[in-house]
Structures are given as C-alpha cells and as structure tokens.
Amino acid sequence: MSFVKDFKPQALGDTNLFKPIKIGNNELLHRAVIPPLTRMRALHPGNIPNRDWAVEYYTQRAQRPGTMIITEGAFISPQAGGYDNAPGVWSEEQMVEWTKIFNAIHEKKSFVWVQLWVLGWAAFPDNLARDGLRYDSASDNVFMDAEQEAKAKKANNPQHSLTKDEIKQYIKEYVQAAKNSIAAGADGVEIHSANGYLLNQFLDPHSNTRTDEYGGSIENRARFTLEVVDALVEAIGHEKVGLRLSPYGVFNSMSGGAETGIVAQYAYVAGELEKRAKAGKRLAFVHLVEPRVTNPFLTEGEGEYEGGSNDFVYSIWKGPVIRAGNFALHPEVVREEVKDKRTLIGYGRFFISNPDLVDRLEKGLPLNKYDRDTFYQMSAHGYIDYPTYEEALKLGWDKK
C-alpha cells in the first residue's frame, strides 16, 4: 500500500466543505459524507453484519466528530436480497449487531443513516431460488443482461414482474426496516432508488414496460419510489428520510443519458419531493450519483457522461443535496461545488482507504491508494487495516 501518486492535494479547510450544516435532526460539523459502500463482509446465513470487524470499520471512519455516515446498503427483507454477504435489517440477530455499530459511531460524536436496499433484477436468481424466493423486477419481458436471464432460467426462477399486492408488501417491508433501524439507534434512513436496483428499475423506461399505474408515463414510473417516500415519512418522520437517485447512471443496465426523457423523469421526482416539502414534509436530503461516475465499477475518470448535469435538481428541490462521484482526486471541482450552500460531498472509495479522510481533505494531505481487489473480499485486510496519515508516515509511505 502507498499514497496516490501524481495527485496534488489541496487543503479544503477554507471552503464550505468545513462549514456546519443541519441534516434532519443532525448538526453536522462538516459536509464530507460517507456514502453507502457495499463491502460484502456480512455473515451467511442470516445476512448479519460482521461480528468481528464491522464495529471497528465504522468506528475508524466516524473518528472525526460531526461526520455523517450512510451505511452500506441493507436488505429490508429476505425477498429484497439475493447476495449472501450483504447485511439485512429485518431480523433480531441483525439488529443486535447494528446496534453495536450505531452506538460506536455515536460514541465518536458522528451520525449514522441506514441505506434501505432492494435488488430486483440485480439479485442472484440462483441464491433466491435456493431460499425459495422470487426473482423480481418491474417487468418480466426485458432483462438486465443475457447472463442474468440465463441464470434465472437455469435456476428455474424466471424474472417476475411485481403484482400490485407485492409492491404493497415491499412498502410494508420498507416501513418495518425503517422502524427497525430507528429503534436500534440510527439517526435516519436513505431510500436506495439509484444504481439500477428495484426502485430505479421502476423509474427507468428501459426496465419498466408496465401498462398499469406503475408504468407507461413519467408519473406512473415514479409512483413506487414516491409511495415508499410517503410511507416512511408517515412511519418515522420526514426529517429522518433521505432519497438516493442516479439520473445518468448506466449500472445494472439503466438507460442513463441515452434516454431522452431522463431529465424530465427525475425533474418530476424532484418536483414531487419539493411539493411535499412545501406541505411541511421536507426530506432530510436528496443524494445524487453524479454523471462523473455512471458505473461504480469503473476506475476514476472512466465512464463519465459529459452530456448532462445534475444541476437541474437545484432549480426544483430546495433542500440539502449530497453529490457523490469521483471527487477525492478533484479538490478543485469540490471547491466549486460547495460554493452552493446546500451541497454536501460524498466520498466513497477514498473513505475506504483513508479512515481519517476528513482530516486529509481539510489539510490537503496525501491520500492512501485503495485496493479494489479487497473491496468485496471476506477479509479484515483491505477493510480495517488502512492506516491514518500519521500511521502511514511511521510506515515510511512518504519515502515510497
């Protein structure tokens, strides 16, 4: 391991990134947010947060007081899942471990929001079949890719277009998952409606070919996401709910900028959120994946969509906005983005490799390189063994 080469850090301590901001009921002391980072360390069976390492992992990254952490995506129910080593928030056994994590983050005087996750067609159909569960999506006549279609057929678990009753059941499970999270001590929840997972599959005209009230128009495609928003606001309060969107994302076979109506689709969602805000139910934040990163599996600078911007959201939605996507190596871009006083910045991959990232951003210190090979590996290595800047100096990284 070593510092990133060919990168000139810039101190950002004099920017709005280091001005306090209130998100929901939380008084953040800076605006560098840890976005959801799937790490595949949960225990199987049971999708239980890792008993040996998870508390340490989150504690390390909560070390700067006043930091907002959004957890790795957590499945709201067994049916929502399909990955053995991602955590859930439906069982007592899971919540025991989450409570330890939440307490550890709060002991560092930081804040924690749980990302609520439903996979849809991105799930492994064979895992679902093994557990007697459906392989769900918005439609059953268009597939994520040929490989997923073949896997589903081989597992005798063909892609299933959700019925209206099944949509209602998912909404109930979202509510229960949100209640479980808050009861265990979380500060709030983020609804994952981005990156090609189930709610995004309903938003996108490529994956949603329905002809009922959940498809066929901008309003109908947004219905499921907005019903989840309304149900959670009712259940736990608007100030404890945020929403993640990725208008230009192409991960998991979404349309991104290739869809001519994509801005109209997301402008409608933003408008509906602002309408609710004006009625006294403003969400804590909207979280946007930037077109700078259309696919999280690509290296920094690859797959950038240059034909559009998320700036349109600001003219509609008047609450806080978290922007995530390839910012760590571009402090000059961050300096511009945070001139807007409603903006927070999500730092993902470099929060994995730099547990003290906030200090480094403030002072303009070198950044630890990350090791992509350990992102999803069931090991403590690459999870809880990245050094702080001071530790890296003791290891002689500045001489490498």
UniProtKB/Swiss-Prot annotation:
Q: Cite the entry's keywords alphabetically.
A: Flavoprotein, FMN, NADP, Oxidoreductase
Keyword Flavoprotein listed? The answer is yes
| Enzyme Commission (EC) number | 1.6.99.1
In which residues is substrate bound?
H192, N195, Y376
Impact upon substituting Y197F = Reduces oxidative half-reaction with 2-cyclohexenone 6-fold
Which InterPro entries does UniProt cross-reference here? Aldolase_TIM, OxRdtase_FMN_N, Oye-like
Q: What class of enzyme is it?
A: oxidoreductase
Tell me yes or no: is Flavoprotein among this UniProt entry's keywords. yes
Q: Known Gene3D superfamilies for this protein?
A: Aldolase class I
Q: Which reaction does it catalyse?
A: A + NADPH + H(+) = AH2 + NADP(+)
Give an example GO molecular function. Answer: NADPH dehydrogenase activity
Q: Which residues bind FMN?
A: T38, Q115, R244, R349
Name the active site residues: Y197
Cofactors needed by this protein, per the record, are: FMN
Identify the SUPFAM superfamilies for this entry.
FMN-linked oxidoreductases
Quaternary state and interactors: Homodimer or heterodimer.
Q: What does this protein do?
A: Flavin-dependent enoate reductase that catalyzes the chemo- and stereoslective hydrogenation of electron-poor alkenes. The enzyme is reduced by NADPH, and oxygen, quinones, and alpha,beta-unsaturated aldehydes and ketones can act as electron acceptors to complete catalytic turnover. The physiological oxidant remains elusive.
What's the family? Belongs to the NADH:flavin oxidoreductase/NADH oxidase family.
Q: What is this protein called?
A: NADPH dehydrogenase 1
Question: Organism source for this protein?
Answer: Saccharomyces pastorianus
Phylogenetic classification of the source organism: Eukaryota, Fungi, Dikarya, Ascomycota, Saccharomycotina
